A protein has these predicted regions:
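Short amphipathic alpha-helical interaction segments
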Residues: 140-155
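A short, conserved structural fragment
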Residues: 154-164
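C-terminal scaffold of the Radical SAM
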Residues: 1-141
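Accessory beta->alpha helical hairpin/"wing" motif in late/C-terminal subdomains of nucleic-acid enzymes
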Residues: 162-176
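Residue-level detector of family-conserved "landmark" positions at structurally sensitive sites
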Residues: 43, 146, 163-164
Length: 176
């Protein structure tokens, strides 16, 4: 659990259980949801078959999205770069900056060297992982460039790798 700044949880932090208790609670939750027909398809999401959140799947597949409105985030792939943007967080600042023609408060260009990490950080949240072709289409890089690191993670029991799919193992889902 991450207690985000500027939230009620950060202001009034609850007492959190110890590691083993957390693991036991997670296993109990997963078992109960599985018994009700819900699969843990993503690190923090459960759904019945065919009911997964398509909006979030786009994030985890490193797809593009355009955020509109105060505090909204975007990820945009252009022909020569990938950008992450954040609109002005506070509505009054957002409106003022829209009028001035500067709706973006922060913009980060993701360098080509950072794309493998960005992609894997998202795609390995999914229990089903991703096909290697998706990596190549979303990063414009060959999977061979990261294959040694993927094979090392497989040797550590964190990934299952086949020609069709790269996915976290149950152990990998706990630690990746």
């Amino acid at each position: 659990v991450t207690l985000e700044p500027n939230t009620r949880f950060a202001a009034f932090p609850p007492e959190l259980p110890e590691g083993d208790t957390c693991a036991d609670m997670q296993e109990a939750i997963e078992a109960r949801l599985a018994g009700a027909g819900f699969a843990n398809y993503e690190t923090s999401a459960f759904a019945q078959t065919g009911k997964q959140c398509r909006h979030n799947l786009n994030y985890w597949h490193f797809g593009d999205y355009l955020g509109i409105g105060a505090g909204a985030h975007s990820k945009l792939t252009l022909h020569d770069r990938v950008l992450r943007q954040m609109r002005w967080k506070h509505p009054s600042a957002y409106l003022q900056n829209i009028r001035a023609g500067t709706p973006v408060q922060e913009e980060t260009r993701i360098a080509a060297a950072g794309l493998p990490f960005e992609f894997l950080m998202n795609a390995l949240r999914l229990a089903d992982g991703f096909p290697p072709a998706l990596y190549e289409s979303r990063t414009a890089q060959s999977i061979n460039g990261i294959l040694p690191r993927l094979l090392a993670a497989q040797a550590d029991g964190l990934l299952a790798i086949s020609p069709e799919r790269i996915a976290p193992t149950l152990r990998g889902r706990r630690f990746l």
